[in-house]
From Swiss-Prot:
<dbReference type="InterPro" id="IPR004368">
    <property type="entry name" value="TIF_IF1"/>
</dbReference>
<dbReference type="Pfam" id="PF01176">
    <property type="entry name" value="eIF-1a"/>
</dbReference>
<comment type="similarity">
    <text>Belongs to the IF-1 family.</text>
</comment>
<dbReference type="InterPro" id="IPR012340">
    <property type="entry name" value="NA-bd_OB-fold"/>
</dbReference>
<keyword id="KW-0694">RNA-binding</keyword>
<dbReference type="InterPro" id="IPR006196">
    <property type="entry name" value="RNA-binding_domain_S1_IF1"/>
</dbReference>
<protein>
    <recommendedName>
        <fullName>Translation initiation factor IF-1</fullName>
    </recommendedName>
</protein>
<comment type="function">
    <text>One of the essential components for the initiation of protein synthesis. Stabilizes the binding of IF-2 and IF-3 on the 30S subunit to which N-formylmethionyl-tRNA(fMet) subsequently binds. Helps modulate mRNA selection, yielding the 30S pre-initiation complex (PIC). Upon addition of the 50S ribosomal subunit IF-1, IF-2 and IF-3 are released leaving the mature 70S translation initiation complex.</text>
</comment>
<feature type="domain" description="S1-like">
    <location>
        <begin position="1"/>
        <end position="72"/>
    </location>
</feature>
<dbReference type="GO" id="GO:0003743">
    <property type="term" value="F:translation initiation factor activity"/>
</dbReference>
<keyword id="KW-0648">Protein biosynthesis</keyword>
<dbReference type="GO" id="GO:0005829">
    <property type="term" value="C:cytosol"/>
</dbReference>
<comment type="subunit">
    <text>Component of the 30S ribosomal translation pre-initiation complex which assembles on the 30S ribosome in the order IF-2 and IF-3, IF-1 and N-formylmethionyl-tRNA(fMet); mRNA recruitment can occur at any time during PIC assembly.</text>
</comment>
<keyword id="KW-0699">rRNA-binding</keyword>
<dbReference type="GO" id="GO:0043022">
    <property type="term" value="F:ribosome binding"/>
</dbReference>
<dbReference type="GO" id="GO:0019843">
    <property type="term" value="F:rRNA binding"/>
</dbReference>
<keyword id="KW-0396">Initiation factor</keyword>
Length: 72
């Protein structure tokens, strides 16, 4: 899979949902649902409410994303 056309934005975790999903408020004040990427799962990185994260979005569905990096 190529990363062409992917949109990367920063956001803040608002709530944790079940199944490794989170509600994230992006820097442009849009709230999306984001899943945790595979590498974050493998290395067991904890993501909590209030953390700043980097989210990757597909241009086809801007309401769902993938958390690819935890900033703090």
């Amino acid at each position: 899979m190529s990363k062409e056309g992917k949109i990367t934005l920063k956001g803040k975790v608002v709530t944790a949902l079940q199944g490794g999903q989170f509600k994230v408020l992006l820097e442009n004040n849009v709230e999306i649902i984001a899943n945790v990427s595979g590498k974050i799962r493998v290395y067991k990185i904890q993501i909590l409410k209030g953390d700043t994260v980097e989210v990757e979005l597909s241009p086809y569905d801007l309401t769902r994303g993938r958390i690819i990096y935890r900033i703090s």
